[in-house]
């Protein structure tokens, strides 16, 4: 006798089992039947693929170790690579709730075992996941401790004092969908045991960029961004947006937004960078009618617009970052839609470095060997050791964001999923030889997909 299984049979059986269990729940405490909650708790998750990277908005390496890297994903926690080729998640099971969305990560320059992690991304799409505060690790990411700022929601940057690992600054955009008093710059001098808000403009304005003079850690620059997200749109820019500077570790901040040479119109998002080899050189990429890339050679007192190309700021709300080479103050990187742009003449002209995926958000430049780059984009984290000529694959980090998943009636059933900026994929739920290989998955659509649904009894019909 031949028995034919179908997903419809399994669904029916599951409904009967759950119904039976539910019916026993109300029979009093003497019932020996387990409730559905206990039944479901026995199930275990397993990764089935497709092992593709998802959006990464924060990355960092470790000076002194050319093969150690960290990448924060916006839906899959923090990942670590010890060889530049393989990645492992180091926050699974340790960060509660929505903390799987990572907005910022920083390594203490004076003690690379100390890491700070800010949850909730600040690149304000309409599908962002809020975070629930800041975490600290004292053992290079093996264990994590919650250290506060639960209501910051979206952390855009973390900066650690170059000499004291317990002095740390956090830039917060706050609640992105409403005015929020938890926006601004926060400081701790005791490793996160206590916090003080050092820079606040108003409830509509958060801190989107924060950089430090590595030679004088009391000198910092902050970019404040007046922005509120709505499900149907974004309000970017206003009188709250601006650039601020402190020379006393955040005790006092000076508004330098209207210094000579900077835009005279309303500002939107701003990205900042200090040239470590010559910290009087500061770069700013500014969203404004008269915006562009600006450079100061006197620590922010005067500025010159050195570039106004639209290609560097065509999606200002999503990227708008700039990074100066730690050794060469005239080499500058600007991530953008379809490339990582690089300039070798102080941001006057830029050439394109192609990356494995578009929508580029961030780049870390190794201060010991500036040919080593770690870049984050909508397809994951990728590493170059030749100045951006070649990059590692992003198909080794299962962090892509799935909007929706579906299954068909095959046995074993197949899985269909639509991903943020990675298209839609179809793959098996099991594999006779063990782990499901990447080759077992097939891309069925490209671009920004939301649903991928087959006809249940005929998966060839989408």
Where are these regions (language model features)?
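Bacterial N-terminal signal peptides that target proteins for export
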Residues: 2-14
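Beta-propeller blade termini and top-face loops
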Residues: 29-462
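Cleavable N-terminal signal peptides
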Residues: 15-16, 26
């Amino acid at each position: 006798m031949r028995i034919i299984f179908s997903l419809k049979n399994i669904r029916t059986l599951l409904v009967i089992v759950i119904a039976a269990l539910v019916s026993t729940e109300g029979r009093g405490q003497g019932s020996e039947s387990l409730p559905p909650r206990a039944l479901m708790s026995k199930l275990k998750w397993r990764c089935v693929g497709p092992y593709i990277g998802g959006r990464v908005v924060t990355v960092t390496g470790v000076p002194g170790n050319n093969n150690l890297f960290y990448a924060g994903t916006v839906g899959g926690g923090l990942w670590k690579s010890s060889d530049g080729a393989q990645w492992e998640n180091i926050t699974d099971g340790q960060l509660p709730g929505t903390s799987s969305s990572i907005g910022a990560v920083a390594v203490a320059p004076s003690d690379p075992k100390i890491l700070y992690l800010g949850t909730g991304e600040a690149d304000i799409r309409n599908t962002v996941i809020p975070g629930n505060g800041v975490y600290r690790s004292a053992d290079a990411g093996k264990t994590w401790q919650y250290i506060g700022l639960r209501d910051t929601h979206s952390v855009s940057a973390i900066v650690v004092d170059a000499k004291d690992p317990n002095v740390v600054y956090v830039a917060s955009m706050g609640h992105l969908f409403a005015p929020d008093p938890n926006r601004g710059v926060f400081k701790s001098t005791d490793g996160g045991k206590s916090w003080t808000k050092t820079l606040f403009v108003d409830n509509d304005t958060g801190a989107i960029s924060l950089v430090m003079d590595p030679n004088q850690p009391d000198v910092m620059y902050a970019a404040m961004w007046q922005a509120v997200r709505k499900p149907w749109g974004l309000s970017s820019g206003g009188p709250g947006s601006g650039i601020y500077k402190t020379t006393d570790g955040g005790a006092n901040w000076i508004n330098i937004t209207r210094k000579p040479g900077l835009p005279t119109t309303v500002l939107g998002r701003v990205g900042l960078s200090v040239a470590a080899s010559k910290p009087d050189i500061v770069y700013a990429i500014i969203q404004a009618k008269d915006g562009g890339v600006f450079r100061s050679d006197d620590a922010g007192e005067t500025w010159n617009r050195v570039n106004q190309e639209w290609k560097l700021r065509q999606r200002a709300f999503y990227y708008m970052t700039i990074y100066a080479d730690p050794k060469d103050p005239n080499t500058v990187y600007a991530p953008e839609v379809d490339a990582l742009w690089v300039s070798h003449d102080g941001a006057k002209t830029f050439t394109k470095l192609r990356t494995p995926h578009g929508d580029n958000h961030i780049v870390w430049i190794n201060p010991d060997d500036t040919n080593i780059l770690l870049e984050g984009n909508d397809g994951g984290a990728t590493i170059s050791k030749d100045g951006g000529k070649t990059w590692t694959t992003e198909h080794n980090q299962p962090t892509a964001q799935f909007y929706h998943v579906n299954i068909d009636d095959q046995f074993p059933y197949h899985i269909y999923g639509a991903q943020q900026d990675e298209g839609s994929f179809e793959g098996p739920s099991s594999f006779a030889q063990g782990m499901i290989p990447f080759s077992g998955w097939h891309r069925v659509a490209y671009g920004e997909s939301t649903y991928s649904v087959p006809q249940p009894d005929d998966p060839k019909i989408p």
